[in-house]
Amino acid sequence: MQVNGEGNNLDAFFEMIDLIEDDISEMLENENSELSGYECLVISFNCLTLFCRQVEIDFSQIEDHFSESEKTKSGENSLGFDSSIDLKEHNEVEAFNGMLEGIENTLASFEKRCKKTDELFDEWNCVFIMYTCLRKYCDKTKVNYGELIDDVSKLQSNLEKEKQTEKEDTKSLN
């Protein structure tokens, strides 16, 4: 995912969503893989935090903005995200895929709204919308966000260690 300008960043953002969907589909097709809604959240937050790093968005700023917006609003849903998914009617992965579709619909609605108003349709707002939807999903499914983000950090740390080991192995072969 190469990111240079704002347009490219938006393209990369939507590519990231497609990659999340592809990763989940791939894991579902693998007979040896068991996938739950929690793993889907780990995949999504992993991709989202990596994207933020690539486009130099401070992820903690997104978290802080979300916390502030939660304090100031009185239960309203200004983004138009439908968090009414009935988790009892779906398995966890189907419910998560439905939520991803909801994110895409929310982003499309926001883009239309931006064309009519002075709001900016950029990668920061897209990240914030996705983050908000994922956090609302965590709340709805009673997933502990702090533990989830710790798991994402551990995953990223392990991937970095693996990447470093591969580089060292490649150097020693030459």
PLM regions and their residue ranges:
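N-terminal targeting leader peptides, primarily classical Sec-type signal peptides for secretion
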Residues: 1-3, 73-76, 173-174
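Charged, low-complexity interaction regions
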Residues: 25-38, 56, 112-122, 142-146
